[in-house]
Amino acid sequence: MRIRRKKWAREELDNSKFYIDKPEEFKGKWQEKFDKSNPLHIELGCGKGLFIATLASKNRNINYIAVDMIEAMLGLSKRNIEASYDYENPENLFLIRANVEKISEVFDKTDEVERIYINFCNPWPKK
Protein backbone atom coordinates (compact mmCIF):
# COMPACT_ATOMS: atom_id res chain seq x y z
CA MET A 1 0.00 0.00 0.00
CA ARG A 2 1.43 3.33 -1.04
CA ILE A 3 0.51 6.23 1.19
CA ARG A 4 0.31 9.68 -0.29
CA ARG A 5 2.27 12.41 1.39
CA LYS A 6 0.29 14.35 3.98
CA LYS A 7 1.48 17.96 3.84
CA TRP A 8 0.00 18.67 7.25
CA ALA A 9 1.61 15.69 9.02
CA ARG A 10 5.03 17.19 9.79
CA GLU A 11 3.63 20.36 11.38
CA GLU A 12 1.03 18.47 13.40
CA LEU A 13 3.63 16.02 14.69
CA ASP A 14 6.01 18.84 15.60
CA ASN A 15 3.24 20.50 17.64
CA SER A 16 2.13 17.28 19.32
CA LYS A 17 2.97 16.65 22.97
CA PHE A 18 3.05 12.90 22.43
CA TYR A 19 5.32 12.72 19.37
CA ILE A 20 9.05 12.31 20.00
CA ASP A 21 11.24 13.54 17.15
CA LYS A 22 14.53 12.04 18.38
CA PRO A 23 13.65 8.76 20.09
CA GLU A 24 17.27 7.59 20.26
CA GLU A 25 17.83 10.18 23.02
CA PHE A 26 15.61 8.10 25.33
CA LYS A 27 17.30 4.75 24.72
CA GLY A 28 17.53 2.98 28.06
CA LYS A 29 15.36 5.54 29.85
CA TRP A 30 11.89 5.36 28.34
CA GLN A 31 10.12 4.97 31.68
CA GLU A 32 11.42 8.41 32.70
CA LYS A 33 9.48 9.92 29.79
CA PHE A 34 6.13 8.77 31.19
CA ASP A 35 4.36 10.35 34.17
CA LYS A 36 3.69 6.96 35.75
CA SER A 37 5.93 3.91 35.97
CA ASN A 38 3.79 1.23 34.32
CA PRO A 39 4.59 -1.80 32.16
CA LEU A 40 5.90 -0.78 28.73
CA HIS A 41 4.36 -2.12 25.52
CA ILE A 42 5.44 -1.13 22.01
CA GLU A 43 3.79 -1.51 18.63
CA LEU A 44 6.09 -1.87 15.65
CA GLY A 45 4.55 -0.59 12.43
CA CYS A 46 1.57 1.22 13.93
CA GLY A 47 0.16 2.34 10.57
CA LYS A 48 -2.91 4.55 11.03
CA GLY A 49 -2.81 3.94 14.77
CA LEU A 50 -6.29 2.50 15.22
CA PHE A 51 -5.06 -0.55 17.16
CA ILE A 52 -2.80 1.39 19.53
CA ALA A 53 -5.35 4.20 19.99
CA THR A 54 -8.01 1.75 21.15
CA LEU A 55 -5.65 -0.33 23.27
CA ALA A 56 -3.98 2.61 25.02
CA SER A 57 -7.20 4.50 25.74
CA LYS A 58 -8.74 1.40 27.35
CA ASN A 59 -5.60 0.41 29.33
CA ARG A 60 -4.30 3.61 30.90
CA ASN A 61 -2.32 1.58 33.44
CA ILE A 62 0.10 0.53 30.68
CA ASN A 63 2.62 2.77 28.89
CA TYR A 64 2.70 2.48 25.10
CA ILE A 65 5.07 3.53 22.34
CA ALA A 66 3.85 3.33 18.74
CA VAL A 67 6.57 3.10 16.09
CA ASP A 68 6.34 3.74 12.36
CA MET A 69 8.83 5.02 9.81
CA ILE A 70 6.38 6.81 7.53
CA GLU A 71 5.57 10.37 8.56
CA ALA A 72 2.15 10.35 6.88
CA MET A 73 1.14 7.27 8.86
CA LEU A 74 2.28 8.87 12.10
CA GLY A 75 0.20 11.93 11.24
CA LEU A 76 -2.87 9.75 10.75
CA SER A 77 -2.03 7.88 13.97
CA LYS A 78 -1.84 11.16 15.86
CA ARG A 79 -5.31 12.15 14.70
CA ASN A 80 -6.79 8.74 15.54
CA ILE A 81 -5.17 8.74 18.98
CA GLU A 82 -6.49 12.23 19.74
CA ALA A 83 -10.00 11.14 18.73
CA SER A 84 -9.72 8.06 20.95
CA TYR A 85 -8.71 10.26 23.91
CA ASP A 86 -11.47 12.83 23.26
CA TYR A 87 -8.84 15.26 21.95
CA GLU A 88 -6.81 15.36 25.15
CA ASN A 89 -3.13 14.47 25.22
CA PRO A 90 -2.57 10.86 26.26
CA GLU A 91 -0.35 10.38 29.31
CA ASN A 92 0.44 6.75 28.56
CA LEU A 93 1.33 6.88 24.86
CA PHE A 94 4.06 8.28 22.63
CA LEU A 95 4.54 8.16 18.87
CA ILE A 96 8.02 7.82 17.42
CA ARG A 97 9.44 7.66 13.92
CA ALA A 98 11.97 4.86 13.58
CA ASN A 99 12.99 2.08 11.24
CA VAL A 100 12.18 -1.26 12.85
CA GLU A 101 15.31 -2.78 11.30
CA LYS A 102 17.33 -0.40 13.51
CA ILE A 103 15.15 -0.62 16.61
CA SER A 104 18.19 -1.36 18.78
CA GLU A 105 19.16 2.30 18.29
CA VAL A 106 15.95 3.31 20.09
CA PHE A 107 15.36 0.61 22.72
CA ASP A 108 17.72 -1.09 25.12
CA LYS A 109 17.23 -4.17 27.28
CA THR A 110 17.17 -1.83 30.30
CA ASP A 111 13.91 -0.38 28.94
CA GLU A 112 12.23 -3.62 30.05
CA VAL A 113 9.66 -3.84 27.27
CA GLU A 114 6.99 -6.22 28.52
CA ARG A 115 5.15 -6.78 25.24
CA ILE A 116 5.66 -6.10 21.53
CA TYR A 117 2.80 -5.89 19.04
CA ILE A 118 3.38 -6.41 15.32
CA ASN A 119 0.21 -6.22 13.23
CA PHE A 120 0.23 -6.40 9.45
CA CYS A 121 3.65 -4.86 8.91
CA ASN A 122 5.13 -4.90 5.42
CA PRO A 123 7.39 -7.99 5.28
CA TRP A 124 8.85 -7.16 1.87
CA PRO A 125 11.61 -4.56 1.99
CA LYS A 126 11.76 -2.30 -1.03
CA LYS A 127 14.92 -2.56 -3.12
Predicted regions located by residue number:
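Conserved beta-strand/loop positions that form the S-adenosyl-L-methionine
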Residues: 44, 67
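Short beta-strand element of Class I
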Residues: 62-65
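Conserved SAM/SAH-binding beta-strand->alpha-helix loop
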Residues: 70
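Mobile active-site "lid"/loop adjacent to the S-adenosyl-L-methionine
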Residues: 113-127
